[in-house]
Amino acid sequence: MPHSFPDYSFTCPFCKNNCKLSFAQCPAFCPFCGKSQKNESTGLPIQSDFYQIIKSIGKGGMGEVFLAYDPCYERQIAIKKIRSDLLEHPQIKKRFLKEAHMTSQLTHPAIIPIYTIRSDADTAYYTMPFVEGDTLKQIIRKTKLQEKNGETLDYLGGSILALMRVFITICQAVAYAHSKGVLHRDLKPENIIIGKYGEVLILDWGLAKFIDQSPEEELLASFPESLTKQKDITKIGKVVGTVAYMAPERALGQPATIQTDIYSLGVILYQLLTLKSPFKRGTLDEFRKNMSREEWQDPVTAAPYREVPRMLASFTEKCLSLDLQNRYQSVEELIRDIENYLEGRSEWFCIANLNTKEKNDWEFQENVLIAEHVAITRMTDDAEWVSLMISKQSFTGNTKIEADVCLGEQGHGIGFLLSVPEASAREHLIEGYCLWLGSDFSKTTKLLRSNVEVVHAPDIFLKRQQTYHVRIEKVDKSIHVYINDNLQFSYIAHIPLIGTHVGLLSRDADFEISPLEIYVGNLNINVNCLAVPDAFLAHRDYNQALSEYRRIAYSFPDRTEGREALFRAGLTFLEQAKTAENKMPLLEEALNEFEKLHGTPSAPLEYLGKALAYESINDSEEEIKCYELAYRRYPNHPILPMLQEQIISRLHEVSRMQRITTYRFTLLTVRHLPLNKIDTHTKRLFNSLQKHWEVLPFIEYKSPSPLTTLSTRFATPLAFWLAKPFILGEILDDLIQSPPFPIEEVNNALLCLVELGSWEYAQEKLNTIQTYLNLPQNPKWLDLKAFIACHYQTLEDVYKDFFFQIPSTNADHLHAVLYFMDQCLDQLNTSLIYTLARQFEHAELSFEDRLRLNCRRVWAYLLDKNWQDAGNLLYTYSVETLNKDSSLLHFLYGCWLQVTEGAEIANVHFAGVNPVMFPRTWTLGARFLTNNLSKDSYEKAFMWEKRQLCKQLILYYHCVGNETKRIHFQKLYQEQFIHAEL
């Protein structure tokens, strides 16, 4: 034992005085206080080994529980000792000690802990805390008597809500024991004690067993005849447990399971609700005989004055179901239902059945083509036909959808729609939420919000040719998805959707589905203070909603609800502005409301709100600035996931119609959102963007790393297309901090700066890199210096300094050569172009590189109006190549035809360009000259595209001799540069 006292040591449990005795026996009276040292009821001596027994507090079949004093720790404890007449029976003793050992392995606040265990030839006992209080049985009995006598009810027994808090603690302890593989097998109110200070403890684990434990012996070899007559000892080999709390299948000899413990919990729950047992049972044999005649009485009718909630009555009935399939499968399921009750949620009411075969149930029932990312693609390669059905009836508040689904052999899945807006408010076909349940053929289960993936769950799928019960619950801002009554995942929506319709979506017809059962549960006992103004907002009562939001914000300035109310007050103005003739005053009011969140713990909501305000007036640039400010000022704020969800949603939304805005949101996403939070749906959008954008000729990647890694390789061209030199500067700063030094990425970012016109900024960045990193000279730096030198030296000097001594066979510096040639064309210095062309005449160039070099030569000939040499060089290529709009020579050949063959032939040639939504830059001039490029298209073009168009038209009008238009486009050309400086 961990502590020991000699036999002659004595401590009085009453006055706590200690002395040493010259004899081993406990004295009859304390020599200090004079109190008797014998138990008045049993006459037993107070001293027991190392503890002083004070009194007996309970008896059972195998043992007795005493209140005792532990002198080592100076505390009162409870000792459970085996009956002395049972010590001689090894199996009884073993069973007694098994309870102690099994309980000691369970560590839970609601399971009584074990202090010590002792067993020898003379005794067997274990110690545990002494808890002052009443058993649940005593509380039920006392409350029932008070009710009968018309007295004031016990504070606990008289409150079903308080009893449910106790019950859920019991359930949590049992669930914990089950998780450790232990069954209690004797759950009943007398084994549960409620402490003086609210402690809830499950006692008496004497019948507990491990779930996977082998069956006990059927018979006890030497079971004494004297014990067989004692009813208070459960016989080994017999069905163990208390009949009143025993599951029917257990009484019939089936082994104990988790569901038999759940049945016992159901009986306890029934007693807590009604103060009476659900069934009258006698002995085990009588129970077996009368089992089929037991009648269920609903707790609501069994105790009409207790006002038993129907929800709790239904939980009780499910616990006590004779059909194991209908009984709770785990205690966790019961806990979830009890928690729903404690949170005040009402029960669901079925108000509609929507049959896919009944046309009158559906407002919209068509096959539609869903195309994604149209704003950034040249063809609808991300499009598919789907069958779409939207309910005619609307469902407000909390909504639940239930249906049985069976996918066929070729079925890919089924989609459930909810929170779909009214037809007049739908900007796109699929709005609201869509739960797509994929089959085992595709495994693409996901939850989408306005066609944007917010949950990706590939491990959840429906096996083909099997029927599943699907349940979707939308409660407040949460969506819970169940399959066969098992929760699969939950999702919390940060920005509410107000839609009230439901629907179905399918990619094929290979499925069977039962009519959709639609439930609503609008009432909630514990109403969130925001629910009231939310309801006003949903019904467009803006003034009342605003008044309530402001009142909540004023009342709870330091709580999340108060700050959320400020945010929603701003949203109220935005909703009101949607239908107002004069929006601007309302938008100003919204911005003022969002401004109040500045400096609070919910500060990012200020920028989210302002972004929503700018979105409402289609000012995407200011909208994105708000998101950038939020991420820059609060990079690790816990509210940022709300902004992230909105950013991703907006990215997919604008990808349908707005190309430049899509690029802006993509750059924002790549630069600020965590890479591991980018979902597969968004990555697919990035892949589509990369596939369809024009490859910039001055960006070079020799390593195989793909752009879709969302690294700077993706951000750099995005920043260039959007003409964002300072973001390129930030990218460079990030690259410098990324060892090993990524020379290729740094060079590309610097070249982008030069091409934008920010060559001074590029020079300063290059100087910083070389000064602080002390890098060795690199051939790429030489090319970059040549790029920059074109802007502050004469072209002749640049040629002498950088290109004069380049070996004629060396093509490594071709990028710099081509850039230098472009500068010569801009300054009409064609002689240097001819010189460089001769210098590289015998260089080993690829077909594409030779083509780009020859394009500059043809351009120079056309500037010099040297039609002969221009034609000779053009006709070194086939007519088929010259007529292809995919060739860089296409526009140059058209200019040559204009001056040599006439306008009619040239127009036919220019008109041969393919009609695509976003043409390549080298076809822009041809489209403009054939009136296939609108002024609106020009306004929506990127700066680089405008520059290339102007450059082509400068050449064309130079060739035809229209000096006025040439000068006009020359001025426009000069405007397409950004001269950023540090």
UniProtKB/Swiss-Prot annotation:
Superkingdom in the source lineage: Bacteria
PROSITE patterns: PROTEIN_KINASE_ATP, PROTEIN_KINASE_DOM, PROTEIN_KINASE_ST
Leading EC class: transferase
This protein's UniProt keywords: ATP-binding, Kinase, Nucleotide-binding, Phosphoprotein, Serine/threonine-protein kinase, Transferase
CDD domains per UniProt: STKc_PknB_like
Annotated binding of ATP, by residue: I57, G58, K59, G60, G61, M62, G63, E64, V65, K80
Modified how: Autophosphorylated on serine and threonine residues.
EC number: 2.7.11.1
Recorded catalytic activity of this chain's protein: L-seryl-[protein] + ATP = O-phospho-L-seryl-[protein] + ADP + H(+); L-threonyl-[protein] + ATP = O-phospho-L-threonyl-[protein] + ADP + H(+)
Positions of the catalytic residues: D186 (proton acceptor)
Domain Protein kinase: 51-342
SMART domains named among the record's database cross-references: S_TKc (SM00220)
Pfam families found in the cross-reference section: Pkinase
GO terms for MF: ATP binding; protein serine kinase activity; protein serine/threonine kinase activity
Family: Belongs to the protein kinase superfamily. Ser/Thr protein kinase family.
Function recorded in the entry: Together with the serine/threonine kinase Pkn1, may play a role in the specific interactions with host proteins during intracellular growth.
Alphabetical list of HAMAP family matching this protein: PknD_kinase
NCBIfam families listed in its UniProt record: PRK13184.1
Protein name as it appears in the record: Serine/threonine-protein kinase PknD
Species whose genome carries this gene: Protochlamydia amoebophila (strain UWE25)
Organismal lineage: Bacteria, Pseudomonadati, Chlamydiota, Chlamydiia, Parachlamydiales
Name of the encoding gene: pknD
